[in-house]
C-alpha cells in the first residue's frame, strides 16, 4: 500500500484565521500534541514574517524530534536565510518555498512575466538546496494556472532540486474531478515527476477541501496538507481529522496507509479549539459533540443491538474516552495526576500542585468534578496566564429588575498596583465590560461573545470566549469560572493581555528592524 504523509499547517495557515493569535507557549503545546498525533510534517510558521514567528519556528524545530518541522518562505534569499537560521536545529530541516503561477497573480500581484516567475522559482530552489536536504515547492493558486505553464515550471523546479511538489487550491475554487485531472496531467507531462512527492493543499471556500484532498490522493498525491478542525483564513482548510478517518475507514477503497495515531485526534481537536477560541460545531464530522450521538428511536434501538448498524466510526478510534472518572473533594493529588495523565495531558510537578489548589477550590463548591471540568482547569492553569499584564482582583455587579446594572472592578498590575473603576450598562455583562474598558483606558470593540457550560448541572462551570478589536489588533480571549460574570471578566482580560502582548512584540520587531 502507498503511504500518505500528513503535512499539518495549523500553526501557519490555521493561525491565519481571523482573531487567532497564539503565543509561543501555546504554539509549542500544539506542536507537541501534533507530534503525539504522529503527523509527518509540522509547518511551524513563516520565519521571515516577524521576530515572533521566527522564534516560534526555531523553538518548535528544536523541541520536536519525531517529525519534520518546516517553515514557509517566499522565493527570495532573505526569506530562505531566515528560514535556515530558524530550522537548522531541527531533526529533519525542510523548506517550503512558494511563488504564484496563475495569470491573475502574476499580472496583478507579482507584476512579473511567466519567464521571470520560472527564473525566480528555479533560483530560489537552487539557493535553498545549499542548506536544506528537502525543499518543497508550491505553485500558489495552481488551480487557476494554465496547465502547460504549470507543467513547465514544475519540470524546471524538479531539475533545480525540489523533492516535493505542492499543488494548492489557494482560493478553494476547484472541483474534485478537475483537481484529480491536474495531478494526472502533471504525471503525464512532466519529466522525472516520478522522482518527487506530489502534495495537495486545499481550501474550503466552496466546501470541497476534504473531498478535493481525497481526490488528489486517488490521483497520485502522496502528501496532504491540512489543519486541525479545518481552521484557516476565510472558510478554512481541509480538516486533518476528516481526511485521516476517511482513509482509515475506507482503506478498502483508497488502499493507503498513514502513520497517524488516530486515538490522539479528539485530544488534538480539543487543544486547538481551546487555544484558538475557534469553537468546533456540534455536528462537525469526527470531532463534533454530536458525532456519536443518536436521537432517533430507531437509530438508538439499532445501536444498542449492534453498534455498526448506525456507527461507522467508534468513539474510541479517535480517542473519545469510553469511561469518565468522577473526582470529588476527598480525591487526592495522586488520583488527580492519574486522571490528568489518563486524559492525555503532561503536567510538571509544579503545574500539578497549582492545579490541585484550583481543583480543591472547585471541589468545595461542586460535588462532582468531571473530565470536562478537569480539562477546563488544566487549560486555565497551563495557558491562561502566559503574560498577565493585568489580573482580576475582584468584581461586584449589582442587578435588579428596576435598577440600572452597575459593575465595580479591581485589577492588579505590575508590582502591587491596582486599578478600580465602576460603570453602568443596559445589562450586567454590558456594565462589566464598560467598567473594564475604563480600566484599560482604550476603546475596545467587542466582535464576538460566546458562553457555554462545561458539562451539565446547576453547578456547571461557565466558559466564555470573546473576540475583540483594539486599534488594528484583533484577537480572542477565554475565561472559566462557576460564575458567568467572573468568567466573562476573565475572558475580556485574557483578550486584552493578548492585545498588549502583540503590541509589545510589534514594537520589539520595529526596534530590531530600525537598529
Swiss-Prot record:
<feature type="region of interest" description="Regulatory domain">
    <location>
        <begin position="391"/>
        <end position="515"/>
    </location>
</feature>
<protein>
    <recommendedName>
        <fullName>2-isopropylmalate synthase</fullName>
        <ecNumber>2.3.3.13</ecNumber>
    </recommendedName>
</protein>
<keyword id="KW-0432">Leucine biosynthesis</keyword>
<keyword id="KW-0464">Manganese</keyword>
<dbReference type="Pfam" id="PF00682">
    <property type="entry name" value="HMGL-like"/>
</dbReference>
<dbReference type="InterPro" id="IPR002034">
    <property type="entry name" value="AIPM/Hcit_synth_CS"/>
</dbReference>
<keyword id="KW-0100">Branched-chain amino acid biosynthesis</keyword>
<keyword id="KW-0963">Cytoplasm</keyword>
<dbReference type="InterPro" id="IPR013709">
    <property type="entry name" value="2-isopropylmalate_synth_dimer"/>
</dbReference>
<feature type="binding site">
    <location>
        <position position="201"/>
    </location>
    <ligand>
        <name>Mn(2+)</name>
    </ligand>
</feature>
<comment type="similarity">
    <text>Belongs to the alpha-IPM synthase/homocitrate synthase family. LeuA type 1 subfamily.</text>
</comment>
<dbReference type="Pfam" id="PF08502">
    <property type="entry name" value="LeuA_dimer"/>
</dbReference>
<comment type="pathway">
    <text>Amino-acid biosynthesis; L-leucine biosynthesis; L-leucine from 3-methyl-2-oxobutanoate: step 1/4.</text>
</comment>
<dbReference type="InterPro" id="IPR005671">
    <property type="entry name" value="LeuA_bact_synth"/>
</dbReference>
<comment type="function">
    <text>Catalyzes the condensation of the acetyl group of acetyl-CoA with 3-methyl-2-oxobutanoate (2-ketoisovalerate) to form 3-carboxy-3-hydroxy-4-methylpentanoate (2-isopropylmalate).</text>
</comment>
<feature type="domain" description="Pyruvate carboxyltransferase">
    <location>
        <begin position="4"/>
        <end position="266"/>
    </location>
</feature>
<dbReference type="InterPro" id="IPR054691">
    <property type="entry name" value="LeuA/HCS_post-cat"/>
</dbReference>
<comment type="subunit">
    <text>Homodimer.</text>
</comment>
<dbReference type="InterPro" id="IPR036230">
    <property type="entry name" value="LeuA_allosteric_dom_sf"/>
</dbReference>
<keyword id="KW-0028">Amino-acid biosynthesis</keyword>
<dbReference type="InterPro" id="IPR013785">
    <property type="entry name" value="Aldolase_TIM"/>
</dbReference>
<keyword id="KW-0808">Transferase</keyword>
<feature type="binding site">
    <location>
        <position position="203"/>
    </location>
    <ligand>
        <name>Mn(2+)</name>
    </ligand>
</feature>
<dbReference type="GO" id="GO:0003985">
    <property type="term" value="F:acetyl-CoA C-acetyltransferase activity"/>
</dbReference>
<dbReference type="GO" id="GO:0005737">
    <property type="term" value="C:cytoplasm"/>
</dbReference>
<dbReference type="InterPro" id="IPR000891">
    <property type="entry name" value="PYR_CT"/>
</dbReference>
<dbReference type="GO" id="GO:0009098">
    <property type="term" value="P:L-leucine biosynthetic process"/>
</dbReference>
<feature type="binding site">
    <location>
        <position position="237"/>
    </location>
    <ligand>
        <name>Mn(2+)</name>
    </ligand>
</feature>
<dbReference type="Pfam" id="PF22617">
    <property type="entry name" value="HCS_D2"/>
</dbReference>
<feature type="binding site">
    <location>
        <position position="13"/>
    </location>
    <ligand>
        <name>Mn(2+)</name>
    </ligand>
</feature>
<dbReference type="InterPro" id="IPR050073">
    <property type="entry name" value="2-IPM_HCS-like"/>
</dbReference>
<keyword id="KW-0479">Metal-binding</keyword>
<dbReference type="GO" id="GO:0003852">
    <property type="term" value="F:2-isopropylmalate synthase activity"/>
</dbReference>
<dbReference type="GO" id="GO:0030145">
    <property type="term" value="F:manganese ion binding"/>
</dbReference>
Amino acid at each position: 500500500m502507498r503511504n500518505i504523509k500528513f503535512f499539518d499547517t495549523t500553526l501557519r495557515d490555521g493561525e491565519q484565521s481571523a482573531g487567532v493569535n497564539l503565543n509561543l507557549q501555546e504554539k509549542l503545546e500544539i506542536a507537541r500534541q501534533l507530534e503525539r498525533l504522529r503527523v509527518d510534517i509540522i509547518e511551524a510558521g513563516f520565519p521571515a514574517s516577524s521576530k515572533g514567528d521566527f522564534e516560534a519556528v526555531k523553538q518548535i524545530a528544536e523541541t520536536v524530534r519525531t517529525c519534520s518541522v518546516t517553515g514557509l518562505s517566499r522565493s527570495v534569499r532573505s526569506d530562505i536565510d531566515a528560514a535556515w537560521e530558524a530550522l537548522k536545529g531541527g531533526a529533519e530541516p525542510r523548506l517550503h518555498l512558494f511563488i504564484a503561477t496563475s495569470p491573475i497573480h502574476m499580472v496583478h500581484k507579482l507584476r512579473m512575466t511567466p519567464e521571470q516567475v520560472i527564473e525566480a522559482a528555479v533560483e530560489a530552489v537552487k539557493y535553498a538546496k545549499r542548506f536544506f536536504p528537502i525543499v518543497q515547492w508550491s505553485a500558489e493558486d495552481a488551480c487557476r494556472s494554465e496547465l502547460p505553464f504549470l507543467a513547465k515550471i514544475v519540470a524546471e523546479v524538479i531539475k533545480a532540486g525540489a523533492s516535493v511538489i505542492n499543488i494548492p487550491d489557494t482560493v478553494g475554487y476547484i472541483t474534485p474531478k478537475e483537481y484529480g485531472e491536474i495531478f494526472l496531467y502533471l504525471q503525464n507531462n512532466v519529466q522525472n515527476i516520478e522522482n518527487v512527492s506530489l502534495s495537495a493543499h486545499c481550501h474550503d471556500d466552496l466546501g470541497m477541501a476534504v473531498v478535493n484532498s481525497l481526490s488528489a490522493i486517488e490521483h497520485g498525491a502522496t502528501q496532504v496538507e491540512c489543519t486541525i478542525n479545518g481552521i484557516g483564513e476565510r472558510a478554512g482548510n481541509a480538516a486533518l481529522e476528516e481526511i485521516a478517518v476517511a482513509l482509515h475507514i475506507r482503506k478498502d477503497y483508497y488502499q493507503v496507509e498513514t502513520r497517524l495515531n488516530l486515538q490522539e485526534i479528539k485530544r488534538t481537536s480539543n487543544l486547538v479549539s481551546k487555544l484558538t477560541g475557534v469553537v468546533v460545531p456540534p455536528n462537525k464530522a469526527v470531532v463534533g459533540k454530536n458525532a456519536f450521538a443518536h436521537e432517533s428511536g430507531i437509530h438508538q434501538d439499532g445501536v444498542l443491538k449492534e453498534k455498526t448498524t448506525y456507527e461507522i466510526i467508534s468513539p474510541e478510534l479517535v480517542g473519545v474516552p469510553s469511561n469518565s472518572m468522577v473526582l470529588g473533594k476527598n480525591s487526592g493529588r495522586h488520583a488527580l495526576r492519574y486522571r490528568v495523565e489518563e486524559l492525555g495531558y503532561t503536567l510538571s510537578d509544579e503545574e500539578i500542585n497549582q492545579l490541585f489548589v484550583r481543583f480543591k477550590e472547585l471541589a468545595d463548591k461542586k460535588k462532582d468534578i468531571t473530565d470536562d471540568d478537569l480539562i477546563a482547569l488544566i487549560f486555565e492553569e497551563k495557558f491562561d496566564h502566559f503574560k498577565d499584564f493585568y489580573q482580576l482582583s475582584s468584581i461586584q455587579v449589582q442587578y435588579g429588575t428596576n435598577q440600572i446594572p452597575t459593575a465595580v472592578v479591581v485589577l492588579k498590575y505590575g508590582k502591587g498596583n491596582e486599578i478600580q473603576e465602576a460603570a453602568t450598562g443596559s445589562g450586567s455583562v454590558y456594565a462589566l465590560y464598560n467598567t473594564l474598558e475604563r480600566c484599560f483606558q482604550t476603546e475596545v470593540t467587542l466582535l464576538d461573545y460566546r458562553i457555554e457550560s462545561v458539562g451539565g448541572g446547576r453547578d456547571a462551570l461557565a466558559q466564555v470566549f470573546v473576540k475583540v478589536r483594539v486599534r488594528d489588533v484583533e484577537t480572542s480571549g477565554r475565561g472559566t469560572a462557576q460564575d458567568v460574570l467572573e468568567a466573562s471578566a476573565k475572558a475580556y482580560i485574557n483578550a486584552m493581555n493578548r492585545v498588549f502582548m502583540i503590541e509589545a512584540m510589534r514594537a520589539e520587531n520595529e526596534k530590531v528592524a530600525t537598529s
